[in-house]
Curated annotation (Swiss-Prot):
GO terms for molecular function: small ribosomal subunit rRNA binding; structural constituent of ribosome. GO terms for biological process: translation. SUPFAM superfamilies: Ribosomal protein S6. Keywords: Ribonucleoprotein, Ribosomal protein, RNA-binding, rRNA-binding. Pfam families: Ribosomal_S6 (PF01250). One of its GO terms (cellular component) is ribosome. This is Small ribosomal subunit protein bS6. Belongs to the bacterial ribosomal protein bS6 family. CDD domains: bS6. Binds together with bS18 to 16S ribosomal RNA.
Length: 102
């Protein structure tokens, strides 16, 4: 199984209930693509480097998923249809990209 990073930026103005609804939908989309979630980092609202739509902030969710095959298109295409999702990025995790801390 390959490991992937799934990074999402959500609408910064959504409530805690809506965030939970989005998390549930994301979990279902990942499972439907034949993958499993191994880690979730909920970073909350952060300032964006540039404006996305009318927003200068975004609600960040970073998942680590394990999947066989190529789940990128199946997961990303279903998540991009959501109204509260601003950006989706699925990247294959490679150990050589990790930096070593001194």
């Amino acid at each position: 199984m390959n490991q992937y990073d799934l990074n999402l930026i959500l609408n910064p103005n959504i409530s805690a209930e809506q965030v939970q609804t989005e998390k549930d939908y994301i979990e279902n989309a990942v499972r439907n693509a034949g993958a499993e979630i191994s880690n979730l980092d909920d970073l909350g609202n952060r300032r964006l480097a540039y404006q996305v739509g009318k927003d200068r902030e975004g609600y960040y969710l970073m998942y680590t998923i394990k999947a066989s095959g190529n789940p990128e298109t199946a997961i990303a295409s279903s998540l991009r249809l959501r109204d509260n999702v601003r950006r989706v990025l699925v990247v294959k995790d490679r150990p050589e990209w990790k930096t070593k801390k001194a």
